[in-house]
């Protein structure tokens, strides 16, 4: 799967751009503020319905316009597919796939799986468990068609349970919701656990290439003691949950633990090593997607030269090429990427003040 055409209209400082990317490595270069990262952001927005740089989607709309429009043609094994997205400053979003209106943004994610390696994406290890849960759930969503419905139900029931706790409801009033919570939690947890087990098999080899001297152990924690029955735990923790006004334990507390010996990876590894570990996780996730459902991710790699030294840039780019996936990588100077590749980029784009030029 690859993008063979991308139209960007009124996205940040890009007034209008049309790209015909290669299915291999696409190098986008230009000075800071030129708009090169905005191209990656537009692709991500088209696949996720949101930005990886700002939580306020209205901010990505060009200041002089009331809406942005993104359009892409995807090359798929079954033939070409067309995706269109329009976001209005009012917050309304319109999405079409092959001319049909789409109501759920999850359909976009299913159609256009995207992996991001940016300065922001390194928060996967540097911040709390939320981003690591999102990492697991991205894979679980793509690997098992039952995951999304179960995950939506977990969120729905958890919201209802927390509202009852804030209302000081008796446990008898909460019991029905607990039965539902347990049922959907078991589904979500089983799929998450199975996914992390599969990821681990691929991850060992990739981590070995990036960090050959380091033994990293990866494990999934479900959000409560695995030796404890979840239904019994909810009942026994009811007084504590009532006091805090929210559910203390459960799938919303799940995490991906990475350890080196007895220490968390965050404490045992240097910042540079942690960045390589995040790269390994993203590449393993993309490779597993291909293995499980025979679909490539699209990799968006932003500002690589500032994040990794020349040796590790070369290693990461080799791994990306080996995936066989489509890659978009940005840099200020093209030589920083070209010199790290064994063969020239399949296509190069220069961006200046929001204008995109193909370099032949």
From Swiss-Prot:
Family recorded in the similarity comment: Belongs to the RecF family.
Main location: cytoplasm
Assigned keywords, A-Z: ATP-binding, Cytoplasm, DNA damage, DNA repair, DNA replication, DNA-binding, Nucleotide-binding, SOS response
GO biological process, alphabetically ordered: DNA replication; DNA synthesis involved in DNA repair; double-strand break repair; SOS response
Residues noted as binding ATP in the record, renumbered to the chain: 30-37
Protein name as it appears in the record: DNA replication and repair protein RecF
Stored NCBIfam families: recf
Species name: Shewanella sp. (strain MR-7)
SUPFAM superfamilies noted in UniProt: P-loop containing nucleoside triphosphate hydrolases
InterPro entries: DNA-binding_RecF, DNA-binding_RecF_CS, P-loop_NTPase, RecF/RecN/SMC_N, RecF_2
Cellular-component GO terms for this entry: cytoplasm
Summary of the function given for this chain in its UniProt record: The RecF protein is involved in DNA metabolism; it is required for DNA replication and normal SOS inducibility. RecF binds preferentially to single-stranded, linear DNA. It also seems to bind ATP.
């Amino acid at each position: 799967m690859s993008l063979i055409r991308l139209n960007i209209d009124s996205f940040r400082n890009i007034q209008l751009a049309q790209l015909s990317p290669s299915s291999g490595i696409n190098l986008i270069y230009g000075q800071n503020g030129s708009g090169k990262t905005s191209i990656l952001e537009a692709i991500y927005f088209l696949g996720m319905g949101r930005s990886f740089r700002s939580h306020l989607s209205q901010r990505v709309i060009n200041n002089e316009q009331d809406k942005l429009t993104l359009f892409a043609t995807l090359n798929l094994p079954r033939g070409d597919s067309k995706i269109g997205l329009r976001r209005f400053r009012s917050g309304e979003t319109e999405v079409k796939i092959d001319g049909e209106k789409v109501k759920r943004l999850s359909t976009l994610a299913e159609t256009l799986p995207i992996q991001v390696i940016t300065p922001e994406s390194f928060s996967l290890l540097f911040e709390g468990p939320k981003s690591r849960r999102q990492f697991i759930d991205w894979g679980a969503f793509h690997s098992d068609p039952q995951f999304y419905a179960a995950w939506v139900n977990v969120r729905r029931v958890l919201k209802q349970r927390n509202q009852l706790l804030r209302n000081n409801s008796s446990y008898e009033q909460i019991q029905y919701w607990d039965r539902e919570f347990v049922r959907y939690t078991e589904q979500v947890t089983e799929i998450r656990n199975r996914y992390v087990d599969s990821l681990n098999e691929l991850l060992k080899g990739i981590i070995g290439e990036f960090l050959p001297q380091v033994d990293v152990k990866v494990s999934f924690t479900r959000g409560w003691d695995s030796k404890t029955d979840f239904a019994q735990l909810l009942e026994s923790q009811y007084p504590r949950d009532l006091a805090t006004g929210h559910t203390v334990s459960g799938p919303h507390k799940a995490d991906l633990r990475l350890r080196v010996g007895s220490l968390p990876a965050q404490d045992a590894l240097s910042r540079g090593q942690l960045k390589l570990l995040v790269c390994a996780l993203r590449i393993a996730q993309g490779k597993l997607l291909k293995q499980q459902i025979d679909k490539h991710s699209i990799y968006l790699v932003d500002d690589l030269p500032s994040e990794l030294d020349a040796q590790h840039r070369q290693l990461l780019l080799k791994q990306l090429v080996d995936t066989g996936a489509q890659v978009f990588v940005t840099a200020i100077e093209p030589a920083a990427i070209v010199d790290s590749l064994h063969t020239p980029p399949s296509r190069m784009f220069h961006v200046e003040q929001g204008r995109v030029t193909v370099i032949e």
